[in-house]
Amino acid sequence: MSVKNIRNFSIIAHIDHGKSTLADRIISECGAISDRQMSSQVMDTMDIEKERGITIKAQSVRLNYKFNNENFVLNLIDTPGHVDFSYEVSRSLASCEGALLVVDASQGVEAQTIANVYIALENNLEIIPVINKIDLPNADVEKVKHEIEHIIGIDCKDAICVSAKTGVGIKELIETIITKIPAPKTDDEAPTKALIYDSWFDNYLGALALVRIYEGSIAKNDEVLVMSTDKKHIVQDLFYPHPLSPIKTQSLQSGEVGVVVLGLKTVGDVQVGDTITLVKNKAKEAIGGFEKAKAFVFAGLYPIETDKFEDLRDALDKLKLNDSSITYEPETSLALGFGFRVGFLGLLHMEVIKERLEREFNLDLIATAPTVTYEIYQTDGELIKIQNPSELPPVNKIDHIKEPYVKATIITPSEFLGNLITLLNRKRGVQVKMDYITPERVLLEYDVPLNEIVMDFYDKLKSLTKGYASFDYEPIEFRVGDLVKLDIKVAGENVDALSIIVPNEKAQSKGRELVSAMKEIVPRQLFEVAIQASIGNKIIARETVKSMGKNVTAKCYGGDITRKRKLLEKQKEGKKRMKAIGKVNLPQEAFLSVLKID
C-alpha cells in the first residue's frame, strides 16, 4: 500500500456524544464487520467501558475503502474522552494527521471536547467538524455550528451532519476523511522511529505495543530498542489491528499503524509515549512528548477481610500489567490493618480501578478519602512530598505547605451560573475567565485547589446544574496554602484513616460536621464513646455517643437500698474500666462520611 493512500485519524468527543457508535458505523460502512457480527460498541472492549459508556483504553482498527477506483487504508485510532486519560489522548492524537470533532446536535460543545481539541491543534491535525445525532427532535445544527466557531474557532461551513444511529451522512464523512486529511509525511531512508500510543497485556503473547511508524520500517525478527529503557528485544510478531481478530503481517512500513509483539512480561516495558527504533540503525533522538503517567489522586485501599491482603497485592500486580499508570505501596493503618496507598490519574480512574478489583478479583474493599500530593517545606530547609495526611510532620517542624492547583473549565446553562459561582468560591476557586458562548450558555475558567475537586466537586456540580454542566480540569502548579491536619479521635484513639488536610479557616466547621456525621454512624456501646476532632493537641469539636443502659438492679427485689447502690457503683466501676480498654469497631460508612462533608 502506497503511503499516499493511508489516512490516520481519530475521533474527539465528549462522553455520550456518540463517538463509539460513530466508530462502529464507520467500521460497518467499510465492510470490516458484517452486520451479523456487529456488537454495539466494537471499539470498547472492557465491560466497564460498555456499562459506563466511556472509552478508557485507546483502541485502533485498520479499514479498507475504495474511492474513485483507488484503494485506501483508513486507520481509526480511538481516543479516551475522559479528562483522567488525557495523556493517552495526546499520544493517540500524535499518531494521526487528522481528527473528527464530534459534537452532539442537541447538546452542543462540552468542556472535555475543548481540552482534546486543543491537544489536536497543538499536534497540527486537520480537524473535520462532525455534528452527530441530527435525527433527534431537539437537534439544533446551526446553534452547534455557531458554538464550535465561537469557542474553538474552527470554520463550520463544511461541517458534516450525520446520525451514527441511522447511518445518515456516514458515506460522505468517509469520503471527506480521504479528501481532507493529509497522507502521512514519511522518510523511508531515515532510521526507524515508532511511537507507542497504547499497550496492553495478553495472556498468551505478553505485553503488546500498538505503534504508529513515523520513519523507516519494522519487520518480523528485527532487533529493536525501546528508547526510554534502552532495552533490546526481538520482534516476534506483527499484526494490523482489526475489531474481530488481528491480521498478521511480515512488516510495518512508515505511516502505518500496527501491533508489535516483543514477548515482554509487563506493559511497564512498553510505556505509552515511548519510541521504538532498530538496533542496527538507531534513531538519534526519541519522538518528543514522552512523559511517564503521573498519579494525581491517592487513596488507601484495604481489604475488609484482613487475610485478603496478599490477594489484593496479586490483583494490583495483575492490573499493573495492563495499566502502568497505577502506583501502589503497602501501608498500615491502626484502624484498618494492612492495605495499599494507591495512586490514580484522577477520580474516574480511581472508581474504575476499585470497581475492577472488586468485580474481576472478587475483593471487598474499603477506600479511604482521596487525597493529593502536598509539598511540605520544613523549618530545616528540607522538602518532602506526602500523599497520606497521617505522614504530615508536627506543626513546629513545618515552615509552609504547597498544594496542587488545577485549571477547571466548566460549561453551564446560564440559569445555574449564580449557584456555580457560589460553589466555586466555597471551594477556594479563583476566577480566570467568564465567557457567554450564547445567551443561554456560559464558559467559566477557574483556578481551584485539586484537593477541593477530589472530594465531591463533580457530584455537587451535577446536582446544582441538574446534570447540564460539563467539567474538565488540567494541573497547573503548586501554590502555598494555609493548611492544617484534622484528626478524628474515637474513644480517645486516633483513627488515622479519617485524618484529612483542610484549609485553616474551614477546620472548625469541617471538624464539627465530621463529628456530628460520625455520631450518627458509630454504634452505641455499653460505655460512653467520645468522638473528637482535633488539630495537633487542641480539641476543636466533640460529640458523645450515649451508652446503652443495663438494668443491674432488676433482680434485686425490694429490700435494702444500699444493696442497689452497691450494684450501681460496681456497674460504674466496670464501665470506667471498659471505657479505658474498650475497642469501638467502626463501620465502612464512617470512612465514607469524610467524603460527604462539604
Swiss-Prot record:
Enzyme class: hydrolase
Catalytic activity: GTP + H2O = GDP + phosphate + H(+)
GO biological process: positive regulation of translation
Domain of life: Bacteria
Domain tr-type G: 4-185
NCBIfam families: lepA, small_GTP
EC code: 3.6.5.n1
Keyword Lipid metabolism among UniProt keywords: no
Family: Belongs to the TRAFAC class translation factor GTPase superfamily. Classic translation factor GTPase family. LepA subfamily.
Protein name per UniProt: Elongation factor 4
Gene assigned in the entry: lepA
Cited Pfam families: EFG_C (PF00679), GTP_EFTU (PF00009), GTP_EFTU_D2 (PF03144), LepA_C (PF06421)
Function: Required for accurate and efficient protein synthesis under certain stress conditions. May act as a fidelity factor of the translation reaction, by catalyzing a one-codon backward translocation of tRNAs on improperly translocated ribosomes. Back-translocation proceeds from a post-translocation (POST) complex to a pre-translocation (PRE) complex, thus giving elongation factor G a second chance to translocate the tRNAs correctly. Binds to ribosomes in a GTP-dependent manner.
Native organism: Campylobacter jejuni subsp. jejuni serotype O:2 (strain ATCC 700819 / NCTC 11168)
Keyword Ribonucleoprotein carried by entry: no
InterPro entries assigned: EF-4, EFG_III/V, EFG_V-like, EFTu-like_2, G_TR_CS, LepA_C_sf, LepA_CTD, LepA_IV
Keywords per UniProt: Cell inner membrane, Cell membrane, GTP-binding, Hydrolase, Membrane, Nucleotide-binding, Protein biosynthesis
Binding-site list for GTP: 16-21, 132-135
Topology with respect to the bilayer: Peripheral membrane protein
Lineage of source species: Bacteria, Pseudomonadati, Campylobacterota, Epsilonproteobacteria, Campylobacterales
Subcellular location: Cell inner membrane
GO CC, one annotated term: plasma membrane
